[in-house]
């Protein structure tokens, strides 16, 4: 029987030197305030440093992440993880489906391609009341949850690097010569 491994947090590598990029969409200011508060509190509790950048809406988040992550890598000060925050509330047209789906897909593509831990805190809801409940730190705290997700994957990435120096986390295909042996 396989026993799932639960992360207690106590054996996590230190995240004190981690640089976390937080990109927030402020289309709904009151919701954005709560999402950001939850995320920055979680990041501060981990000892990591947050850099917050604001964009108008959810579709601007992935392109902003791509631009800033690339610039940070070129500068020699790469981000260790990203947290995306925003809110998309269903309206009367199909715009909701495009914004919700495309922003999530683009963020996942970036995360996998760059092997960059990313917490997606873009709420996709039917009503403003649902958004408020999910955003509020005192209720569902989805901003904090997105930050915790990014930090957990970062801790996993660092633990893997410590256990296997010189090897990156993720899939590495075998070369033909290795499989012939």
From Swiss-Prot:
GO terms for cellular component: cytosol; riboflavin synthase complex. GO terms for molecular function: 6,7-dimethyl-8-ribityllumazine synthase activity. The keyword DNA damage does not apply. It comes from the Bacteria. GO terms for biological process: riboflavin biosynthetic process. Keywords: Riboflavin biosynthesis, Transferase. (2S)-2-hydroxy-3-oxobutyl phosphate binds at residues 92-93, 134. Pathway: Cofactor biosynthesis; riboflavin biosynthesis; riboflavin from 2-hydroxy-3-oxobutyl phosphate and 5-amino-6-(D-ribitylamino)uracil: step 1/2. Its EC number is 2.5.1.78. It catalyses: (2S)-2-hydroxy-3-oxobutyl phosphate + 5-amino-6-(D-ribitylamino)uracil = 6,7-dimethyl-8-(1-D-ribityl)lumazine + phosphate + 2 H2O + H(+). Pfam families: DMRL_synthase. Belongs to the DMRL synthase family. This is 6,7-dimethyl-8-ribityllumazine synthase.
């Amino acid at each position: 029987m396989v026993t799932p491994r639960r992360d207690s947090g106590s054996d996590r590598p230190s995240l004190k030197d981690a640089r976390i990029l937080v990109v927030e969409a402020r289309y709904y200011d009151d919701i954005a305030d709560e999402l950001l508060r939850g995320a920055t509190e979680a990041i501060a509790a981990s000892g990591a440093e947050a850099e917050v950048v604001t964009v108008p809406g959810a579709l601007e988040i992935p392109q902003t992440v791509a631009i800033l992550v690339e610039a940070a890598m070129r500068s020699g000060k790469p981000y260790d993880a990203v947290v995306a925050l925003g809110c998309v509330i269903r309206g009367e047209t199909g715009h909701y489906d495009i914004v919700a789906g495309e922003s999530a897909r683009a963020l996942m593509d970036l995360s996998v391609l760059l092997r960059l831990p990313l917490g997606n805190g873009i709420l996709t809801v039917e009503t403003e009341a649902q958004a408020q409940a999910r955003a509020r730190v005192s209720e569902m705290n989805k901003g904090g949850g997105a930050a915790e997700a990014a930090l957990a994957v970062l801790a996993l990435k660092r633990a893997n690097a410590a256990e296997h120096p010189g090897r990156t986390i993720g899939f590495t295909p075998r070369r033909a010569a290795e499989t012939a042996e």
